[in-house]
From Swiss-Prot:
Family of this protein: Belongs to the ATPase gamma chain family.
Gene responsible for this protein: atpG
Record PANTHER family: ATP SYNTHASE GAMMA CHAIN, ATP SYNTHASE SUBUNIT GAMMA, MITOCHONDRIAL
Name under which the protein is recorded: ATP synthase gamma chain
Topology class, membrane: Peripheral membrane protein
InterPro entries: ATP_synth_F1_ATPase_gsu, ATP_synth_F1_gsu
Subunit and interaction comment: F-type ATPases have 2 components, CF(1) - the catalytic core - and CF(0) - the membrane proton channel. CF(1) has five subunits: alpha(3), beta(3), gamma(1), delta(1), epsilon(1). CF(0) has three main subunits: a, b and c.
Species annotation: Geobacter sp. (strain M21)
Annotated GO biological process: proton motive force-driven plasma membrane ATP synthesis
């Protein structure tokens, strides 16, 4: 009987856990829809801004703005974007390990490679292994463009002060509910991709001037790239958590089935044993 009670208690415990994982899956699904909408809205804006910078860059010198100047690389900063919460599969662990691989592979190129962490999980993983210059936590629950702009301003200020000569960001880009791609991008110095050669002969009129536009658009470009990486990470986090909770719910259902089978077999064996004892007692009385 003691064994039956322990099995039944475990079944109840697993059922309670399944209720929690199902609820978390539903919450993540609702949050994912909103996060996807934000990502879809941000991508075209970021792409068009990059396109304008490409056109400007074709007709400007590489040192037209301090944010485009390529210095002798001595110090670098890596911005690592993870989540504040867990229970999302390998979302945080995989990205933190990718960041560490980047550090180990590239540290020979820099005299100093420091980190800025966004999200508690990455900070906890990396703080005892590498130099964390700055940490931003608890920003995702109330994430806004203003938050991204403040982070971008910190990066630009440090770059202009020559605290570091290159800035990279690593984050999970959202592809689908099941897929998140670890993405590494260079933020500073800004190096717009060269456009199609067919566009070189096209003349554009810029108001008030190309230099004024660069001064205005380059900081905005950094803000948008930081904001997009945060939005991508949020959508990826909810997708990963939704997938993890769905898998956990299915595993719980499977475990409940196995435990129920074990419980029924044990109960049947206990009943059979009791019947045998009754029959044996009855036979001994007759004898």
């Amino acid at each position: 009987m003691a064994n039956l009670k322990s099995i039944k208690k475990r079944i109840v415990s697993v059922k309670n856990t399944r209720q929690i994982t199902k609820a978390m899956k539903m919450v993540s699904a609702a949050k994912l829809r909103r996060a996807q909408e934000n990502v879809v809205a941000a991508r075209p804006y970021a792409g068009k801004l990059a396109e304008v910078l490409e056109r400007l860059a074709k007709t400007q010198e590489s040192d037209a703005s301090p944010l485009m100047v390529k210095r002798d690389t001595r110090r670098a900063l890596l911005v690592v974007v993870t989540s504040d919460r867990g229970l999302c599969g390998g979302f945080n662990a995989n990205l933190s390990k990718a960041a560490e691989r980047f550090i180990n592979e590239r540290k020979g190129e820099f005299s100093e490679l420091s980190l800025m962490t966004i999200g508690r999980k990455g900070y906890e993983f990396l703080r005892n292994r590498h130099t964390v210059r700055k940490h931003h936590g608890n920003i995702f629950s109330t994430l806004s463009y203003q938050t991204a702009a403040l982070i971008a301003a910190e990066l630009v200020e440090g770059y202009l002060a020559e605290d570091y000569d290159e800035v990279y960001v690593i984050y999970n880009a959202f592809k689908s509910v099941m897929t998140q791609d670890i993405t590494l991008e260079q933020l500073l110095p800004v190096t717009p991709k060269a456009g199609d050669d067919d566009e070189v002969g096209t003349e554009y009129i810029y108001e008030p001037s190309k230099a004024a536009l660069l001064d205005e658009l380059l900081p905005k470009h950094i803000e948008v790239q930081v904001f997009k990486s945060l939005l991508e990470s949020v959508a990826s986090e909810h997708g990963a958590r939704m997938t993890a909770m769905d898998s956990a719910s299915k595993n719980a259902t499977e475990m409940i089935g196995k435990l129920t089978l074990i419980y029924n077999r044990a109960r049947q064996a206990a009943i059979t044993t009791e019947l045998m004892e009754i029959i044996s007692g009855s036979e001994s009385i007759k004898g």
